[in-house]
Amino acid sequence: MLINWFKLISPKNRILKRATLAAKQVDALKDEMRALSDEQLFNKTEYFINELKNNKTTDDILVEAFAVIREVVYRETGNFAYLVQLIGAYVVHQGDFSEMMTGEGKTLTLVLAAYLNMLEKKGVHIVTVNEYLAERDAEQARRIFARLNLTVGCNKANLAPHLKKEAFDCDLTYTTNSELGFDYLRDNMVRNYRDKKIRGLHFAIVDEGDSILIDEARTPLIISGQPKKDFRMYFDADKFVETLSESDYKIDPESRSPSLTEKGITKAEKHFKINNLFDLENSDLFHKIGNALTARKIFQNGKEYIVRDDKILIVDHFTGRILEGRSYNGGLHQAVQAKERVPIEAENVVVATVTYQSFFRMYKKLAAVSGTALTESEEFLKIYNMVVVPVPTNRPVIRKDHPDFMFGNLKTKWEAVVNEIEKIHKTGQPILVGTGSVEDSETLHQMLLEKNIMHEVLNAKNHAREAHIIAKAGEVGSVTISTNMAGRGTDIKLGKGAKELGGLYVIGTERHESRRIDNQLRGRSGRQGDIGESRFFISFGDPLFKRFAQDRILKAQEKLASDYFDSKFFSRFLTMTQKKVESVNFDMRKNLIDYDHVLANQRELIYKQRDKILIASDLTEVVDRMAQNFVEGFVETFKDQANQTMVNPIELSIAVQKELLQGEEVTASQFYNQTLLAAKQTVLKLVKDAISKKIEVMTVGIANNVFRDIIIQQMDDAWIHHLDQMLKLREGVSLRSLEQTSPLNIYVEESKKLFDLMLNKIAKNVILAVCAIINPTRNVDINVEQEHRRLEALKRLEEIKKLEELQNNNNEPAKVLFKFPDQHGNMIEREVPVDNLIQLVDGQIIQAQVAEEPKQELNQLEKADQLDQTLIEAKLAEQQEQKNNSATDK
């Protein structure tokens, strides 16, 4: 994602000013557009497309295009976009975050912005939080764009692959964030490029952007493979953690991450009978103990998860919804299962993974809309390069937000909440109560039952009735308890007579860690200028105070009576605390992206290379490059121990023959007296020649398909292993925090080494697999003793050649000391004239071994390859005996 440096110095007000000016220019064209016939209006789309083809930009045609689509929407649906919707559409088109209050018409705003970008014919994605919204909005958009010859698709789970491809080939595609992310991962696992579904990541508009880009930013999308089935260690770790006392571990109150103290570490080493918990061989045990600590000391049943039918179901921290089909990764889910004593599911191997942060940053242009984003504006700018621009409401917000009620303890707070509900309920004013957890909603539910107050409960345990419950939440006399679930994808409309009673009354039972979530709850009331009110009930027993309370707050708590009080000091303290928590959470997400950026770059390199392999018409050059890469490291392992610049010819020849050429004859003499560089060139030539011969037999087309299958398989296998190694590195790097280098720097350095190892492994396995198809059925039978004799003969021949040169220089007969057996079989030494030995080598022996090809000229290496030391000695003795009947010693 490219950084727009202008945004770093451009405040939201400046963007809003430009957006307002553009909206007024669009509005000035409404009469002109209204005067056009349907045919004239609809033909404008083709005109815009041609303008863009003629080097115009979308900004050049923005005003007229917005005016056209505004009129088209009016003629098709009867809805005429407000000025604020035009402003919001401008902000979205510019790739920024449009903050629009509930009920301000975000759906139509997205249609306006999408139309302008659809004209580029590169595809626009509108991302929603659930399939219901995606289908609903896609159907509405389809009716509008059909008249303009523009296509609209809806990508859903369980669609057939060809239907998914059709959806993504449309000019506009509605999809959920999770299905879009998984389709991206699946696209990078296909074996045929034509099977890819997403044609490109051009422009995405994220509806409820704060939920997807902030709340779920750290959520990894994971495609799993074959599971790991060793369950014993999960129970062992859980049983150990059960034995710990409070002095054995500590919990960071800000990050909520547990860790063992020195005492706990000692106890663990004694319990598991190991010397050092931090040894690499114990990294898996350390990881499982950490997960067990989180499951036992941090996670609570009814808050982070619920147990249903012996299954662990994750509860969304922000919405209270059950995250269907989700599980904690890295073995944490299994740790929770061990804690709850439910059947442990196998921990899957990660085949492909990406976080929402990394995925959405890959789009060339990214924009978002939501009712609450301003409090996270710094994060959106730094991570997603989006300026949050608050768009004015079409009508003034007249909701009354009352000061918080604060209490000394939980018991008094809940009693006050029930009393407030009872009092307001008697008037008939509709009430929406937001709780922080499923457990709190169940507690309040029981208290209201005791008061005989009729109400509905909306939480993770009955989410199936969500639409029905929300539909009645604005009716007179209704009381609805919700775990923040009403804040996403819902619109509470006031029933008949509710306005006269004061509109929807929102009660918050605790302040959330993020002010944004509090604002979402408040925003359920007062939509489109409706009357309404809100109030929060807070106590020092709330989670926010427990985690971040200061000493003075705790001291004040001891002095306070149980009655509620209104204090500006505590309100300011609460706001400061929320800002502090938001900052901590931002730092955690920023830290995540620092680490994730490393893996994201590696993922991008692998996926791009994978695509090139899939579409290449000739992979010979790719295989040749891999062969060169592999041979470099392969030959290095056969250095001669006595001389590191030379190779060991026997070991290298055997390895080449066994591992690479599958039985093709390779002799040690081919590498005799070769440097590493020369040996690399020799091996590379042997491999390339063998591959070329195979291509000639198979034909280029067939060979290309074979190479593609081999390369893709090896890349996928190596990438899966690499992901596992990176996960272990990420978990283990914190163990080295005592070093002077930062954990992130260590992670960067080590990850590069792992990536290089993976690339080398891919090259090695590809070449070995390619070589295996060259001569797959040949048996390798190497006579090592014979190779030694050949090398010895080669050395002798070199000595002979040197002596021959010496003889030529000195004009004196050169002699060499030679061992041979006498007539009694005893080994003796004799100085033999070089001429005799040269004659012997060039004559009798060579002729005897190449009798069938007497005219063939052999070079010295080929001669040496055929020499047998024993034969030389025997022939030498025979020749001397014929010349001189008695041998004389010197």
Swiss-Prot record:
* Residues bound to ATP: 85, 103-107, 491
Name the UniProt key words of this record, in alphabetical order.
Answer: ATP-binding, Cell membrane, Cytoplasm, Membrane, Nucleotide-binding, Protein transport, Translocase, Translocation, Transport
Q: Which GO terms describe its molecular function?
A: ATP binding; protein-exporting ATPase activity
Q: Does the record carry Metal-binding as a key word?
A: no
GO terms for biological process, alphabetical: intracellular protein transmembrane transport; protein import; protein targeting; protein transport by the Sec complex
Q: How does it sit in the membrane?
A: Peripheral membrane protein
Q: What is its EC number?
A: 7.4.2.8
Q: How is this protein annotated for GO cellular component?
A: cell envelope Sec protein transport complex; cytosol; plasma membrane
Q: What is its main location?
A: membrane
The family database entries (Pfam families) matched by this protein are listed as:
P-loop_SecA, SecA_DEAD, SecA_PP_bind, SecA_SW
- Localization annotation: Cell membrane; Cytoplasm
Q: Which Gene3D superfamilies match?
A: Helical scaffold and wing domains of SecA, P-loop containing nucleotide triphosphate hydrolases, SecA, preprotein cross-linking domain
Q: Does the keyword Transmembrane apply?
A: no
Q: Which CDD domains match?
A: DEXDc_SecA, SF2_C_secA
Which NCBIfam families did the record assign?
secA
Summarizing the function annotation, the protein's role is: Part of the Sec protein translocase complex. Interacts with the SecYEG preprotein conducting channel. Has a central role in coupling the hydrolysis of ATP to the transfer of proteins into and across the cell membrane, serving as an ATP-driven molecular motor driving the stepwise translocation of polypeptide chains across the membrane.
Q: How does it assemble?
A: Monomer and homodimer. Part of the essential Sec protein translocation apparatus which comprises SecA, SecYEG and auxiliary proteins SecDF. Other proteins may also be involved.
What is the name listed in the Swiss-Prot or TrEMBL entry for this protein? Protein translocase subunit SecA
Q: Which organism is it from?
A: Mycoplasmoides gallisepticum (strain R(low / passage 15 / clone 2))
